[in-house]
Amino acid sequence: PLPPPEKIEDLKKELDTYIGLGEVKREVNNLINMATVFKRREEMGLPNADFSLHMVFTGNPGTGKTMIARLMARIYRSLGILSKGQLVEVDRSGLVAGYVGQTAIKTSKVIEKALGGVLFIDEAYALNGKGDNDFGQEAIDTLLKAMEDHRDDLVVIVAGYDGLMEKFIHSNPGLESRFNRYLHFDDYSLDEMLEIF
């Protein structure tokens, strides 16, 4: 059996202890407030605006993206939005296979593991392959369908460098319509680096 969900106050305190990430912390707190209102309205049977929980994390490697993705999974579980709150982390090689039809199967298996939690795809722009023999598009199509079919119990966070991520999202209307929440992770300052290490 799953351990009971953590208290949202405890998770907010944990977020506060992270070094740097000023803008990210503000955004996460906003998101917690919005998600709380969304959940309350849902419980009261009131109509809700369409509220997408999927996110794009942009920034250089080593800026805290995976750490925040893991925390988001726990936050969404705490708020009753996700049933399990686990994080499944993959990159292109975890989704794409070498032959026609295999990529959809491989991607579906990963999605199955992520149901109830967050699927975190690092360097997601690498799915935008070049040439006819690339199966990245098959992975994207499978992912988009799963985001629709499991909209109540799956959150997808895609991450990578700034410009490349924006290009990736805008390359596909399906991605564009589902990912409209961006969180930018700045590089740590010298002082912050000293605090971390």
What feature does the model see in each segment?
Residues P4, L46-G85, K109-K113, F179:
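Walker A/P-loop
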Residues D10-L53, R74:
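Pre-Walker A (pre-P-loop) alpha-helix and adjacent loop at the N terminus of AAA/AAA+ ATPase modules
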Residues S83-A114, Q137:
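Short glycine-rich substrate-engagement loop in P-loop NTPases that contacts/grips substrate
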Residues F185-F197:
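Conserved small helical "lid"/interfacial subdomain of P-loop NTPases
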Residues H170-D187:
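A short helix-turn-beta junction within AAA+ P-loop NTPase domains corresponding to the substrate/partner-engaging
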Residues Y99-T103, Y125-I140, R151, K167-I169:
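Conserved ATPase-coupling elements of RecA-like P-loop NTPase cores
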Residues I111-K113, A139-L154:
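Substrate-engagement module of ASCE P-loop NTPases
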Residues F120-D122, D141-T142, L154-Y161:
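Structural recognition of the conserved hydrophobic beta-strand(s) that form the central parallel beta-sheet
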